[in-house]
Amino acid sequence: MSSDSNISVEEDLKDLLKRCPPGTFEAAVAFRKNKDASYVEKIVMGIIDRHLEPDQREILANSDDMLRMYEDLGMDSLTMLEVVMLVEQTLQVSIDNEELRDLRTIGDVKAYLSAKARGEKPPT
């Protein structure tokens, strides 16, 4: 990749992730450069955080992988769609709507997207 295209990718990511918490943008740039799936969790958590209210952000920050997206974080289907679209753009993956229905917890989301980022079949 040329220097100009690297700058363009970084500018695009910076715009996409502008309201995400610190570290999200940097993880996305690193992921795009080397496709290392270890960055996926930081990216996904940052994108989810961006779409939450302040009290929900605290719940997310102090929880484990069993935290439920809808029940515990109060996410609705529109918010989930916004999260999915931003994750797809950032990670350059496609998320199947049928598989999306099975993602209930933060752990489900992280495992699914980490597998997608590695080019593996996601867990069912």
What kind of feature is each model-predicted range?
Residues 91, 113-117:
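Hydrophobic recognition helices of helix-based DNA-binding modules
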Residues 42, 78-81:
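Short alpha-helical elements of helix-turn-helix
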Residues 4-61, 119-124:
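Thiotemplate assembly-line natural product biosynthesis machinery
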Residues 45, 66, 84:
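Generic structural marker for isolated residues within well-ordered, non-membrane alpha-helices
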Residues 104-114:
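Short, cationic-aromatic polyanion-contact patches
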Residues 80-103, 123:
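Phosphopantetheinylated carrier protein domains
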